[in-house]
Amino acid sequence: MCEYTQRQVCLMNQMRKLWEQHVYWTRFFIISTAADLGDLEPVTKRLLENPGDFAQALTPFYGEEVSDCFKNLFTQHLLIAADLVNAAKSQEAAKAEAARRAWYANADQIAKFLSEINPCWHEARWKALLYDHLEMTE
């Protein structure tokens, strides 16, 4: 069992906030894309800031190299999601399915990465959480 310091609790709360932001900015992106809304550019810009926000929160605990790696994996998560949304909107089933497979493979990479940087973060649990997130987003 892991015991947490005050700093770790602050990180967990910050991560919770960032995940919430990730979810609603992703939803805004999907809605803006699907409905051809005029706010797609600022919504996309804000959504793509989210990986950097995560990296900034992780840096004091894990250093720049680890934070940058997470930022890259999470940016890929968003870019793949955009490919999936755009393929679905264009009714390109093969492209959508390829993006969907890539999205789940990226979730596997994120789960593995997070389990390697923190002994309290278990790969199977992260994978289940990320898959739930993807399924609810689809």
Regions found by a protein language model. Give the residues of each.
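Disorder-to-helix initiation segments
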Residues: 4-15
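Short alpha-helical hairpin
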Residues: 1-2, 20-28, 47-53
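Short, solvent-exposed positions on alpha-helices
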Residues: 13, 68, 94-97, 124
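N-terminal extracytoplasmic segments of bacterial inner-membrane proteins
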Residues: 13-31, 71-85, 128-138
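Short, motif-level signal for alpha-helix interfacial/capping segments enriched in acidic residues
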Residues: 3-4, 114
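An amphipathic alpha-helical core segment
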Residues: 107-138
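Alpha-helical segments in soluble extracytoplasmic regions
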Residues: 32-65, 73-114
